[in-house]
Structure formats: structure tokens, C-alpha cells
Amino acid sequence: MANEIVTTAQDRMKQSLGSLQRDLGHIRAGRANASLLDRVQVVYYGAPTPLNQLASITIPEARVLMVTPFDKSILKDIEKALYESDLGITPANDGSVIRLVIPMLTEERRRELVKEMGKYIESAKVAIRNIRRDAMDTAKKSEKAKEITEDDLKDLENNIQKVTDDAVKEADRLASIKEKELLDI
């Protein structure tokens, strides 16, 4: 029972860290990264469809993304979706592919992105602390129900705290990597 509580908490914390990593991947750092286009939806036959299902996305140069549609007839729809996205990148359509040149970030924009990143980090830490609280509550209920002893409860609480500390350290590590990436010119 005790190991199950810790394992469940650890798995949930890993999911929160995975979500954080995806969110940080969507923050544009002045370099081309295919994950920038993950959230772009193209209206295809009346239904919003993820761009990566309609086109291949390649990185021919450090600051250029190239979108090659599988079906050339939807080139205009893809271009429209890219214009309407909140990426702040103007697509260049050459008739068969769309090129996205990632502009260099200004110092002010870098600082804004670091602030945005801080919000993602904080929400991940809140999620981790909520998972810890849930695990601690479950452990205390188990002790009240006489499923574990008081000594086992203390050990379990220490294990849960260690898992939580490790998850918070990982979130901080991810944050420092992304911040370094954002602030490097």
C-alpha cells in the first residue's frame, strides 16, 4: 500500500513535468523548432486538423522552418492558419512550400518570454505540491484505517517529500535550461 502511494504520486509528478516540458517547447527562443507549430490548426474539409498531420515540417537552417504540404491544394489554408496563429511569424509561400523565418528576439521580448516561462514553472510546481498533498492525505487515511503503522506513515511521508523535492528540482532544471536558451543571443 505504502509503495503504491509513492509510485502513484511519482507517476503523476512525471506527467506534470512532461506537460511542463511540452509547454516550454512552445516558447519561441529565436531558433527554429518544429514544436512551435504543434498547436497550429488548419481548417481542412471543414474540420480543424493539426498542421503536422497535413504537412512535413523541416528545419533547413537554424532560423528557418519549412512546411511542405502532403497535398498542394491546401497550401493557402495552411498559410492562412499560420497567419492567424499567435506565433508572430509571417509565412512566405513560394507555391509549393511555406517558409517561416524566425526573427531574432529583442531583449524586451526575451524578458517577456522568461516571465511567461515563469508562469508555466509556477503552475507545474503548484501541480506537484497538490499531488504531494493528495499523497499525504491518502497516507494519513491509511494510517487512520490501521492499514499502516505510525512509523510507516512517517517513512511514507519522508518518501513522498523526497519524490516531491526531486520533481521540483527537475522543474527548476528545465527552467534554467530554457532561460539560458532564451537569454543567449
Curated annotation (Swiss-Prot):
CDD domains: RRF (cd00520)
Database matches in InterPro entries: Ribosome_recyc_fac, Ribosome_recyc_fac_dom, RRF_sf
First-listed, main subcellular location of the protein, grouped into a coarse class: cytoplasm
Subcellular location: Cytoplasm
Transport listed as a keyword: no
GO BP annotation list: translational termination
Gene Ontology CC: cytoplasm
Gene Ontology MF terms in the entry: ribosomal large subunit binding
Transmembrane segment boundaries: none
PANTHER family: MITOCHONDRIAL RIBOSOME RECYCLING FACTOR PSEUDO 1 (PTHR20982:SF3), RIBOSOME RECYCLING FACTOR (PTHR20982)
Role summary: Responsible for the release of ribosomes from messenger RNA at the termination of protein biosynthesis. May increase the efficiency of translation by recycling ribosomes from one round of translation to another.
Name the UniProt record assigns to this protein: Ribosome-recycling factor
Record organism: Lactococcus lactis subsp. lactis (strain IL1403) (Streptococcus lactis)
Lineage of origin: Bacteria, Bacillati, Bacillota, Bacilli, Lactobacillales
